């Protein structure tokens, strides 16, 4: 794949603009919102193709994410989500990431992206046309596991926590849907596209276009929320057979959409990226070095060498772990609220979660079309980086506080791990936990897409290009999965202790988060200091090695 600004024969009849002239053209508009859509005329086809790839992938992931959650909540136990994330998603992700890293040693990111899109197109078609339609024939009977654990037969033996695990295998087709959707999000949306775009675009193009990619993806996230909202309403009208038929068809359509995405990518490579769009006047000095892989052991070695990397890892781990803990508690609350309101769990869950997607999609798109998207350049890196820890702190107070109050009051007879006597005997407030909780969970996702991701990419661009891929593999690739798994392991611990609802430990979880928040904020302040030093000296960011050396081994 040719880089946009590479030296290729130029058509003398159509003089090319220089990179500076393209930048000036892209930034020439002064009327909002055109002033925020900073794309030059010669870049529109390229931007449109990349935006379609990212937007379509984001739509597929956001819709299938709602579907996978509603499947698990309706056919399994809420705690099963934690087991799936830790015991299935994490190890499979590590294996797949290792395979990807091995492939990248001998193949380009473009080729690996091709393989990934083809594989997921096949998997989604398989889900929609085979696994779900024939689920009753290829998996154990519906009541196989439920009969084993009926009437608390296993409770007195201390094996009640195994119910969730039995259901995961009993309903293995829905478990497969969950794992497949999670992998699609982490591989295609969060890693492959961004890596492909970084190769296709110059740094200055990336700075302008990346916020716009997130605008498009969040507009489609808004469309996804409307789709899931419409679906949840229709489920109440359709009979079981029609519901299954339409639900299965969604995944078949997604498989076809991924195939179209692959074709658009090939079009961009074969017709747009092979042509020179402008004459580069600013390049990135690339040091020569061996192409490195970053497996788990290599990642740990890297982290042990650099204080900077430790801070980046903490920043990622705390965000993903906090999001997982808060969202798990919130989704458990949704499941309990559905019972309290005598509503079908899948429809109730889809209606609530689609509301969350609606808020996130609209607000992120608006925020990224305002000067907020350039806060790093205008007001400093910390103005964006500090938002996620503050939003997560507020969300933890609301979600864990309401979960603590509601858990001990519905259903009757339940008591939380500690302090249940303080709130026992009151009427549960599911409106606060579920409906107001939407805004807390939405706030954390807005903080990620509009603040965390932008600030992370900004500081990543200051890392020496020789080390950047290795370091990003740690805090971008590995830590997202580890952070989610930490939250899931926490929920699993309480399940083993006899609490299948993580909300039972809400006061303990809140106390832990009040300790973690200051540490997270301190790590952001440290990273801001390193970023500012790099900008002021116009040099790669100081990795601040524990050994005092200047270079990684």
Swiss-Prot record:
Keywords: ATP-binding, Cell membrane, Glycoprotein, Membrane, Nucleotide-binding, Transmembrane, Transmembrane helix, Transport. It is a multi-pass membrane protein. One of its GO terms (cellular component) is plasma membrane. The chain crosses the membrane at residues 44-64, 79-99, 115-135, 154-174, 176-196, 210-230, 244-264, 308-328, 362-382, 385-405, 477-499, 507-527. It is found in: Cell membrane. Glycans are attached at residues 27, 406, 532. Its main location: membrane. GO terms for molecular function: ATP binding; ATP:ADP antiporter activity. The keyword Membrane applies. Belongs to the ADP/ATP translocase tlc family. ATP transporter involved in the uptake of ATP from the host cell cytoplasm. Provides the microsporidian cell with host ATP in exchange for ADP. This is an obligate exchange system. This energy acquiring activity is an important component of microsporidian parasitism. This is ADP,ATP carrier protein 2. The gene is NTT2.
